[in-house]
């Protein structure tokens, strides 16, 4: 706030630079006696364009202000008004008035220093006193605005922090946003997992092998595969939709590489194997029993590696596994439970797409994508869908799709299949319908062939008809429903 200074003191602004004290006194002396005329100058002793005039009689000052305000003096309109004291004066020292023409902070500062011998604060006159007592005019001019940018007082410090805080906060927000997003995108790239599951899949990153499929290592990570199981299924579903086969195929073909060298052979062989199937007229499943299953049996230690993941994987997707391994003859499963852990989602997807149980799907699809040879999926699918190849395979092996489970290591899958399937049921509700009873349905040991669990005959009936149609043989049903020991073992003897 500014208050009126000496009642007889006037501020005259907007003066011509050529106007001096004598001229001012001559002009304003007409209104009454003048006690003092103060023209503000810069260092070079040039007028800064404003002055203070003190009348001996305050009434004369008022009259002069009314008469001369807005009048032209030496070619310039001047402003005349009662001089005001600045509210921020300190120690009796007052800020000098500023001219509306001199709005530059540097100009104000220089002129103040020149006339007063330097300044210490943001007020030019704080270091020295004015002859007129430091009175300032009551102006609504840019007088103070010209000086504000250069002031170094507490007010500038108090005003400064908010911008400083806002900028870092914006940076921090952007940094924090980028920090949270980076890993999710990376995880999503690696695993195809929806963002909501990214946090745990990153843990999975650490536990899994460096390969992006990350499902097939024998290093005991498969107890952690439950997390993988939790997150891989969606990725499975995506992969299956995009590529026509599940990641399980990828993991079968890639993951088995980690399990056994024999797996590797089978994994790399599939394309030629697909041709071999066409040449020999038997399905991938048959070939897996004639070749792949031998590999599996020759490497039972592979199955020994898998149990940790089997326990977990089988609990989650055991039912689906059972179907798959049932339909696939455990060909890939003994060596990699991990694959079994990831297949169910994709099987569930296939089940929805094809409208029949996973059993039917595998029967009709010929285990093409369950075999773990994703590259041969389309080819194997078409080949296996042809009834002739399977009929030949069935006749050759003396058993249908059901015999392979006799060879599969059923005991390791145990009854844990169904109760762990509850997790999968939440995520894959429809798949549960098709797999629920099958979880306990096959409880096969390698030596005891495919004994059905009497608890779930309904799903057996639901599952069996399509395989029968797909293969053109009822030996599948016989081997499963009747226990199939003689028949499936006959198939084994024919194979081996």
Curated annotation (Swiss-Prot):
Listed PROSITE patterns: RRM (PS50102)
Protein name: RNA-binding motif protein, Y chromosome, family 1 member B
Main location: nucleus
Pfam families the UniProt entry points to: RBM1CTR, RRM_1
Cellular component aspect of the GO annotation: nucleolus; nucleoplasm; nucleus; spliceosomal complex
Feature: compositional bias, Polar residues: 175-184
PANTHER family referenced in this protein's UniProt entry, alphabetically: TRANSFORMER-2 SEX-DETERMINING PROTEIN-RELATED
Known partners and oligomeric status: Interacts with splicing factor proteins SFRS3/SRP20, TRA2B/SFRS10, KHDRBS1/SAM68 and KHDRBS3.
Compositional bias segments (type: Basic and acidic residues): 204-214, 242-253, 276-289, 313-326, 335-349, 484-496
